[in-house]
Amino acid sequence: MDTTLLDEELASVLESFPVSDLWSDLDATRARAAEMRAKLTGKLPKVESVETEDHSITRSDGPNIPVRVYRPKIKSGQLPGLLWIHGGGYCFGSVEGDDYVVRQLVDAVGCVVVSVDYRLAPEYPFPAPMQDCLDALKWLANNTEMLLVDPDRLSIGGISAGGGLAAGLALMVRDKTDIRLIFQLLLCPMIDDRCVTSSSYLITDKRIWNRHSNLIGWKHYLNKEETCEKQPYESISQYAAATRATDLTGLPPAYIAVGSVDAFVDEDREYAARLQQSGVAVQLEVFDGGFHGFEFIAPKARISQDARELHYQALRNALFAC
């Protein structure tokens, strides 16, 4: 990866990132990621304006699903609702790991958020994580009165693999439910299992999400023996990889954001263009010099603050303009 392409502040932050092997011991990586996230958020100001409540909701094919509900303390009455789906390459991440991210979002936007702790690959490959997200969305839609959520202002969103799950969920909701979504917030979404775009080859730096991790993440999520480099995948569900969809009509308006130095920038641009060609309203933001997930990994950088504000403004416009 050519680090001269990075924003100067982000390049400086990247120098402090460790080079690590994510895949040799998944449990250790998950524990280390949780520790690093706690260390990072511990240095940030607390978000006192948001209250939370944990629930355990019915899963359609197994034990209950943990979800966390976030709500602004100072707002009363019905508010718009967002199902938030955390990132982590389909193999890492948790509700707890995204807790600070969601608190910031709720504080800035003023909506109710349900964050879902979906099952992870490789222990639970597709369709298990997607089914958990669908079950969580159905729970949100069926409990709007209890949650004080406006049933006519439901949305979904996520980052990285969470953005990929959100994109697939939007397709599934269109095809298989009567839930009406008014918006999808897709932050650097991981949506193309084929890994053949130019940008997917360029990011090899082991300090950030790179091509190798992308190949392994998809292999685990799709329950394959080999990566797609060794054995191209066929007949992949559009709900697993949204770029596989041939019909993008009838989907909710989308906000898609990604850094210019992200393995996903090409697939995200292409998906945004295809949505627009299908009559779906799209706001695409490409942040010059941003690596994967920069706005939350390096939260104090100027570019990160600007990016988050654009995310929040897009969500405010979608949820409160109607």
Task: Enumerate the language-model features and the residues they cover.
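Short beta-strand element of the alpha/beta-hydrolase
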Residues: 78-87
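Alpha/beta hydrolase fold serine-hydrolase catalytic domain that processes acyl esters and thioesters
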Residues: 151-152, 168-322
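Alpha/beta-hydrolase active-site loop
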Residues: 124-146, 311
